[in-house]
Amino acid sequence: RFACEDTPEVKQMILDINAQVPEAAKGLHEESIIIDQCNFSFESYSWNLAESGITALAITSMDTKADAGVAIRYLADDISTIHHNADHMLLVEKPDDILRAKDENKVGIILGSQNCEFLHHNDLDATVYLFHKLGMRIIMPAYNHRSFAADGCYQSANAGLSNDGKKLIAALQKYGVTVDLSHVGERSTLDALEMAEKPMIFSHSNPKKYVDH
């Protein structure tokens, strides 16, 4: 299931709202590549995912406190769901897969995490390589609080990246895992951006001037 409740009343309400959307807006939506950058768990393909018309869905595959073993189990669950819904979904492993999802009228699933603790190891290059091979394509260096790599946005010390954090950022970029800086503290964010060799994202954030979180 997704964010909306799967009941007849909710379904009808959403369909009624969508029916009021102007045809020009519907056309723009249909021809555009639409990526939902922040979603949580999912169980199967459903009517509300079809109705959304999105091209790709970035999934937070695991709990923010998951260790490596738990993370692998969560990833296996998500990949199993994709495989069991292969007529409607595909795993996004490279940018062209998003274009392929659009062409094939499927939803591309991007596997990600809003923390990095499951990667903690004396060889971060190796663990990033491993989880990239398992399909992960978006990882956040910290979620609100301090991780081994960075300070989150709720951490009053507001420290920058740790030494391991710098190794993590380097490895993520090396293997093509997108760095997501939502929930990351200001100094850690700026440190990461200083290291940026590839685009980094703020998947669900806003400009500080607009709302200072």
Give the ranges of each region predicted by the language model.
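N-terminal hydrophobic targeting/anchoring segments and the immediately downstream early-domain regions
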Residues: 1-141, 147-157, 210-212
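Histidine-centered catalytic micro-motifs
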Residues: 34-41, 184, 202-205
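Histidine/acidic residue-rich metal-binding segments in metalloenzymes
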Residues: 26-27, 123-133, 154-201, 213
